[in-house]
Each structure stands twice: as C-alpha cells, then as structure tokens.
Amino acid sequence: MNCLRPLAPGGKYLFLATCRGYLNYRAELTVDSLAQKEHQYVLQFPLPSISIPVLVRGVYYEFDKADLTDNSREALDRLVKVLKENPNITIELSAHCDYRGRAEYNERLSQRRAESVVKYLTEHGIEAERLTAKGYGESQPKTVSKKMTEKYPFLHENDVLTEEFILKLKPEQQDVCNSLNRRTEFRVLRTTYGLVDSQGNLVARPQ
C-alpha cells in the first residue's frame, strides 16, 4: 500500500516513532515554503531501549552539593520532554559518584542529587508517582560500552570503572574515568502507568 502523502509548502508536521521495548520519540518538521516539487527531508528517531539504564547527558551539580547548576536546565528539559512523550512509564532516577570520599557520604550525596532532579521534574509537570529517586554513591561503577571506546581509545568494551581499575591508569585517564562514573541515569520501572487499576484491569489505552 502506498502511504506517501504530499507535504504542503510551509506546513508543520509532527511525527511520532514507537517500537515495543523502546521509548517513544517525537520530531517536528517544517516544510520550506519555497521547496521544489520534490524535496527530501531526513528525520532521525533515536529510540533508547527500556531494558538498560539511559544516561542523562548534561546534568551537573555544584561541587560537593546536590544543587543543580544552571547549565543543567537544557538536559533536564529534554528529560521532561521524554517523560511527556512516554506518559505510561515510571522511572527510577539515579545519581552516581566516583570512588573518592567515604562510601556512606557518597551514597547520601548521590541520593540528595537524585532527589534534586526529581524535584525539577515534578516542578515541570511530571507526576511524582512516576518518579523514584535513588542514590547509588560509588556502588555501581560505569561499564564501558562500545561507543565509549571510540571516544576513549584507552578503554575497552565491558571494562568496569572500579577504583582498582582506575588507579592503574595515567592521571589524565583517571580523571576521565572518574567523570564517567559521576553520572545521572534513569531506567524504566513500568510501562503501564495510568493504564491499569489496582486490580490489574485495563482502564485506558496506551498513548
């Protein structure tokens, strides 16, 4: 079946990409009012998997504090957008520290940082019951992905950035690994928020 449709010059279009096991993604397209009869537009739809934690890039905190820096707003607004585009998910929002400092202190600090992010999200329209804040301190060091090895050639896929691993590296490489361990992530807990009642009966269709 031919699903092609002409796009009106100057028109604005909203596209939604969905796939089971992945987060939804929306993209907007404004057609050039002076576009020729045939013009190609390319839209990319990065769909993060819900089976693994998703890194929230660009979230920063004041040194040794839980306060979010001003330049974190853009990243947090993107996360708000993701949650609004996926209204049926609940998430665990986690914060992680590097190994420096006492483990108990790092766990408390990371918990307060996770709570700071959750506070921002609720203040921007996300339901509190969809969000769980969790601080892991230094207990979950980052595992190196294949993509990370392209940016950091001294690392290998599936390396785990533990204290023991990091201390064997050069000082500048240690700094990189510690920064990778200091991160904010989220993972999907449920995909049925607002869809079922307390008895498990379907009350709404997925959005």
Roles of regions detected by a PLM:
Residues M1-T90, E129, K151, Q174-S179, ...:
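Periplasmic peptidoglycan-binding/tethering modules of Gram-negative envelope proteins
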